């Protein structure tokens, strides 16, 4: 589990006690190729996310059929980024804190959420404003969390994977 993400895995089980939480460590294609999923969520928390064309096609079809994908990574690249028309910008701050917040009033914190030491100020430098709902921004107002409606489902993309770990 990336970045000590076992905490979010454990929390998911208590937050969704009536739901099945499954940890998979296989390539996307191997998981989705022979199965039909409906109303499910697929979560990725990685340093960088760059699936190949085959995995991208399976992921796009999975979401188009009404499922959701949450990806939190410093950068999202390759075929998936091209298909969703997004680009990420990477910047590393070794001694500076990063402050992030949500856009939605019901989730927004007055002071935001701060992460210290060894931080990345990564954000979406390009996205299609007609397709995207901005969900979060950095203290510098850079977009770091967004939702893209795709078919019957959604992609939730985030550039602060350390926020979902026990790293800080």
Report each predicted region and the residues it spans.
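Alpha-helical transmembrane signal-anchor/signal-peptide segments
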Residues: 1-13
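A short linear-motif detector with a strong N-terminal bias
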Residues: 2, 22, 48-50, 112-115, ...
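A broad, low-specificity signal for short, low-complexity segments enriched in glycine/proline
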Residues: 2-5, 30-33, 116-122
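Glycine-centered flexibility sites
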Residues: 4, 66, 151-153
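Extracytoplasmic/periplasmic, Sec-exported soluble proteins
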Residues: 4, 51-54, 167-168
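Membrane-embedded segments
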Residues: 10, 20-103, 145
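Catalytic beta-strand/loop cores that center a nucleophilic Ser/Cys/Thr
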Residues: 100-159, 163-167
């Amino acid at each position: 589990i990336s970045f000590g993400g076992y905490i979010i895995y454990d929390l998911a089980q208590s937050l969704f006690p009536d739901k099945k939480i499954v940890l998979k460590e296989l390539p996307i294609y191997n998981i989705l190729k022979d199965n039909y999923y409906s109303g499910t969520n697929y979560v990725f928390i990685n340093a960088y996310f760059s699936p190949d064309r085959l995995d991208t096609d399976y992921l796009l079809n999975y979401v188009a059929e009404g499922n959701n994908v949450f990806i939190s990574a410093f950068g999202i690249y390759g075929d998936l980024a091209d298909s969703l028309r997004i680009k990420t910008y990477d910047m590393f701050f070794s001694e500076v804190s990063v402050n992030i917040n949500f856009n939605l009033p019901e989730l927004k914190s007055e002071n935001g959420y701060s992460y210290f030491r060894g931080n990345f100020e990564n954000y979406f430098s390009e996205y299609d404003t007609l397709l995207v709902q901005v969900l979060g921004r950095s203290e510098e107002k850079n977009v770091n969390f967004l939702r893209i409606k795709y078919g019957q489902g959604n992609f939730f993309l985030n550039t602060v994977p350390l926020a979902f770990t026990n790293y800080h």
